[in-house]
Amino acid sequence: MLTKRQLLVLKEIIRLFTESGQPVGSKTLMQELPVHVSSATIRNDMAALEDAGLITKTHSSSGRVPSTQGYRYYLDHLVEPVRVSRHDLATIKQELGQRYSKMDEIVAQSVQILSNLTSYTAISLGPEVNNIKLTGFRLVPLGNHQVMAILVTNNGNVENQVFTVPPSISSDELEKAIRIVNDQLVGLPLVQVAQRLRTDVPSMLMQYLTSPDGFLDIFGNVLKSAASERFYVGGRLNLMDYLGDSDIHELKKIMSLIDADHGDLTELLGGPIRQTPVQVRLGPELKPIDLANLSLITASYDVGGHGTGMIALLGPTQMPYSKMIGLLDVFREELAKRLTDYYANFDQ
């Protein structure tokens, strides 16, 4: 059981490391702690925190840095969101208050505003995507092994693309595959359809197709076209500012994930959207890939009958969580207000 002073030391180590990026030693803590404590006492407290796995020693310094477990404890029990500055709040209101002709423009601008305010990478999922469901899928033969794939959603949107079907897939096999799609996936939100394409649907198709890849490519591409426009990413290049040369592999992983199909991005954001407060997931907790040196802060925003969207910040593990959590909480409220005002023009 940690003492109040030891928790105060942990909180201060995280604050100082977040601000400087440098390991924190007992002398620095003695100067910065809001209570007078001897250097020896601080060293004992640091030893207790290290034994608990909350801080760790670096090879290049006698100071300590927070561990992933330490960050998690801090986020679960100690973090206190900081109030957004007047300047940042004014910027958010001014930028979101501009004239927009489409909902997508507001959501697209939101990630630019957030990435500019934080210097991190912002990701947003528009509210309507949570309500868009698959209502039908069919293939129309065009001859010469070509088909037109038609995907229909409950908001009246019809996506169609022309594809070349591999000669190895017969028309009977295609019909069986289409029946599986309509039996298993119709009525589901597009984000869930995308996830099932990566999990259990391929094994179902294997019962009728020698290789389901050709059919999955056709269906997956037209599905991506129907939903990908609802995802927006701002500040991609900001990743390069806090991932050094030694993290080039991590940079490649996250870039490929952002550019992949929207099912991967949905999984990164935590799956189908639910109304939740601001949440933080650390690198090892992220899916579908472990991003060891990164953290993701997510927050949902509710637009009444028009659905629930999500806004997220992707940044380094040592980001200032108190400030970012406070900012994201206010930002989602302002974004929800702006979208509600936008929809009010159509609901009258």
From Swiss-Prot:
Keyword annotations for this protein, in alphabetical order, are: Repressor, Stress response, Transcription, Transcription regulation
Gene Ontology annotations of biological process type? negative regulation of DNA-templated transcription
Q: Which domain of life is it from?
A: Bacteria
Q: Which GO terms describe its molecular function?
A: DNA binding; DNA-binding transcription factor activity
**Would I find Transmembrane among this entry's keywords?**
no
Identify the Gene3D superfamilies for this entry: 3.30.450.40, Heat-inducible transcription repressor hrca homolog, domain 3, Winged helix-like DNA-binding domain superfamily/Winged helix DNA-binding domain
The record's annotation in InterPro entries points to: DeoR_HTH, GAF-like_dom_sf, HrcA, HrcA_C, WH-like_DNA-bd_sf, WH_DNA-bd_sf, WHTH_transcript_rep_HrcA_IDD
Summary of the function given for this chain in its UniProt record: Negative regulator of class I heat shock genes (grpE-dnaK-dnaJ and groELS operons). Prevents heat-shock induction of these operons.
Family, per the entry?
Belongs to the HrcA family.
Protein known as: Heat-inducible transcription repressor HrcA
Q: Which organism is it from?
A: Lacticaseibacillus casei (strain BL23) (Lactobacillus casei)
Q: Which gene codes for it?
A: hrcA
